[in-house]
Amino acid sequence: MTVYDAAAFAFGQAMNLWLLIAAINGALAVAAGAFGAHGLQGRLDAHQMEVFQTAARYHMYHALAIGLAALAARTGAASTQANVAATFFLVGIILFSGSLYLLSLTGIRALGFVTPFGGLAFLAGWIALAWAATKAV
């Protein structure tokens, strides 16, 4: 196996991992949305329900964004930036959506301080994806 073959193999594995992470997060976002719509109705007040649905919506948006970054990584010149974007999107899902899920379900307001960091991670992910797009051209 040449160095080129090894690099191509590692690159393909990273892309497959990001696609797997995107698919798992997409499924989790659908499950969360369904749980919120059917399992939590009547158990949460209107504000908590809105917070939960916001978490599920942004979870799905950024699960799709991870998949987009994985596809952008197919262009060798953009792979580093696309991997950075996918990482930021995943961190954003954990911090933003995760904190909102917990906040809506537990009512612990102290969790709210984490949410903006997740939003910043989402923004950084989109900037990194734009950077990847300039490299792919």
Stretches with model-predicted labels:
Residues 3-137:
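Polytopic transmembrane helical bundles with strong interfacial aromatic enrichment
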